[in-house]
Amino acid sequence: MGKRLLFAWLAGLAPALAGAPLPVEEVAPGVFVHGGAQEETSAANRGAIANIGFIVGSRCVAVVDTGGSLSVGRGLREAVRARTALPVCYVINTHVHPDHLLGNAAFVGDKPQFVGHARLPAALAARARTYLAALSRALGPAAGMTPLVPPDTSVQDTLILDLGGRRLELRAWPTAHTDQDLTVFDEQTGTLWLGDLLFVERIPVIDGSARGWLQVTGALRGLPVQRAVPGHGPVTVPWPAALEAQERYLATLVEETRRAIKHRLTLQQAVDSVGLAERGKWLLFDLYHPRNVTAVYTELEWED
């Protein structure tokens, strides 16, 4: 099916399949966030495991991430419609991970611009089949048909979006959590949407560079932010104090992995010993920490 025909089909299907609105919290005037479950995707949560939401201007609405399934995206769209009749003009994806963008197709009928980091389309194309297979395993029949909708507007450095009396600054970052991380800053309220550049309570996941993430964290710390919306955790967190636990975890991994390599520990020995003092401080630690150590070991093994 061609892209144009697929979009037309989705646009016609969406109203018929609209469900209940996702619950959202207004964390600042015109800024609404749905708090994702601190879990892995399952049939019970439908992939609603990330913080997603929308910002309302005087002219239109920008959606920031759309959730981990078409069903979640539809619920978010219904939440928008429950609060405003203004059109959705932008759907912004903060990075490639499926819990943040598999709901994009729910908004195709609104004919928005889909916006993401310049490297997002290639990353999504490379992982599409894997993501959809994983969704089918997790949700079973509830996964249904979840078409992937890539961005049609890319951010190389920064981009300003005007919602009507309300400007959003989008910024593309160097490799950190992933190699396509994007933040969204609402100038009116000083609210910074970080995507997965910030995990709170749930263990950070390294799919880019631990060293790069620490460098980006230093740059983020200096931004004039009133409140922050992390990709996972409470819907808003104090700034910049919320960065501290994640920064400690990443720095610990880098320091201890570097020491393990210096002492000629194998990868498995590093996985079995690095960062274990962090257990008990993070949700899903046992699931993701070994992967993180593996990623950092690979990153540092041949560093100069």
Feature locations, PLM:
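Active-site HxH/HxHxD metal-binding segment of metal-dependent hydrolases
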Residues: 74, 78-154, 158-160
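Hydrophobic h-region of N-terminal signal peptides that target proteins for export
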Residues: 7-19
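Conserved beta-strand hairpin/beta-sheet module of binuclear metal-dependent hydrolase folds
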Residues: 29-79, 182-194
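Metallo-beta-lactamase
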Residues: 21-27, 122-173, 178, 187-188, ...
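Divalent metal-coordination and catalytic microenvironments
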Residues: 30, 55, 65, 80, ...
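Active-site neighborhood of phospho(di)ester-bond hydrolases with catalytic His/Asp-centered motifs
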Residues: 64-66, 89-96, 115-118, 173, ...
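Divalent-metal (often Zn2+) His-rich catalytic cores of metallo-beta-lactamase-fold enzymes
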Residues: 214-265
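C-terminal regulatory/interaction regions
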Residues: 262-304
